[in-house]
Design a protein with these regions (language model features):
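Structural signal for short hydrophobic segments within the conserved structured cores
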Residues: 2, 61-63, 95-98
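A short beta-strand-turn-helix
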Residues: 3-29
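Sec-exported extracytoplasmic/periplasmic mature domains
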Residues: 14, 18, 44, 54-57, ...
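Short pre-active-site segment immediately N-terminal to redox-active cysteine/selenocysteine motifs
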Residues: 27-30, 34-38, 81
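Thiol-based oxidoreductase modules, predominantly thioredoxin-like and allied folds used
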Residues: 34, 45-53, 57-72
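C-type cytochrome heme c attachment motif
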Residues: 37-44, 84
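A short glycine-leucine-enriched loop at secondary-structure breakpoints
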Residues: 43, 76-80
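Non-catalytic, surface beta->alpha helical segment in thiol-disulfide oxidoreductase systems
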Residues: 81, 86-118
Length: 118
């Protein structure tokens, strides 16, 4: 799990300062977990995301964004409620997943959306 700030986001994910048209820069699909330390459901999901990051280590990247520290990134994804997960496939638009869920739900989203082959 990579803790992300604006500089890392612009370098590794998407440079929204240069373009409004989504273009993912990463080499593997990704999940961005937008959270806050005070958020109970966020704390509940954190160990699940860590496990998934290990299980899928060679296939996806999992980033964490603290919305209290990275307000610009929170605003970019309209993170009005957390946890908020941004699932980023290699091509196509990212999909937002709001709220906490169980591990099986996240695994299904990873397998069906991020790792799906045409």
């Amino acid at each position: 799990v990579v803790v992300m700030n604006k500089a890392i986001f612009i370098k590794d994910v998407f440079d929204y300062e240069k373009s409004q048209d989504w273009k993912y820069k990463g080499s593997k699909p990704a999940i961005i977990d937008l959270y806050a330390d005070w958020c109970g459901p966020c704390r509940m999901v954190a160990p699940i995301m860590k496990e998934l990051a290990k299980e899928y280590a060679d296939k996806i990247v999992v980033y964490k964004v603290n919305v209290d520290k990275e307000k610009e990134l929170a605003a970019l994804f309209n993170a009005t409620s957390i946890p908020l997960f941004v699932f980023i496939p290699m091509s196509g638009e990212p999909q937002l997943f709001r709220g906490a869920a169980d591990k099986a739900t996240y695994k299904k989203a990873i397998d069906d959306f991020l790792l799906k082959t045409e």
